[in-house]
Amino acid sequence: MHCPFCGKYDTKVTDSRLVAEGDQVRRRRQCNDCGERFTTYETAELVMPRVIKGDGSRETFDERKLRAGMLRALEKRPVSAESIEAAVERIRQRLRARGEREIEAREIGEEVMRSLKRLDQVAYIRFASVYRRFQDLDEFRAEIDRLAQEPSFSPDDADKR
């Protein structure tokens, strides 16, 4: 690594430590030429899969779209920002863990629905109504009935999934 002070490439690592819950390595370095010390942080570069949209077009995964869709469904609901961010991160981790280069937008929508079902059932119904394009009250009722048949989750369960 080159020295940010003198630009030479002859540096040595003097200390390495895990930080950020083990997701990052902090390294103290020293330039062998000018003697200056500096810190670098190393993280794994994890590429998200490309998204195959319903019309067959492809686009880069956009975490902002994921978060915006969830926030829209959770608007004015008693769910903390921390819980929402944790859910977004869990979805990202599950998508990355698949190891696929591409994923259908439908599958991302299903992941969002699973997360919302655990976070807030009203938000789940809101999202499902748009995502599944409910046309009338009967479709709402059917989804609510399906939801009522499933075992309920406590907020603590959402953190475990």
Swiss-Prot record:
Cofactor(s) listed in the protein's UniProt record: Zn(2+)
Coiled coil: none
Superkingdom of this protein's organism: Bacteria
Zinc fingers (unnamed), renumbered ranges: 3-34
GO biological process: negative regulation of DNA-templated transcription
Annotated signal peptide: none
Keywords: ATP-binding, DNA-binding, Metal-binding, Nucleotide-binding, Repressor, Transcription, Transcription regulation, Zinc, Zinc-finger
InterPro entries: ATP-cone_dom, NrdR-like_N, RNR_NrdR-like
Residues covered by the ATP-cone domain: 49-139
Record PANTHER family: TRANSCRIPTIONAL REPRESSOR NRDR
NCBIfam families reported in the protein's UniProt record: transcriptional regulator NrdR (TIGR00244)
Family: Belongs to the NrdR family.
Function: Negatively regulates transcription of bacterial ribonucleotide reductase nrd genes and operons by binding to NrdR-boxes.
The name this protein goes by in its record: Transcriptional repressor NrdR
Natural source organism: Chromohalobacter salexigens (strain ATCC BAA-138 / DSM 3043 / CIP 106854 / NCIMB 13768 / 1H11)
Gene: nrdR
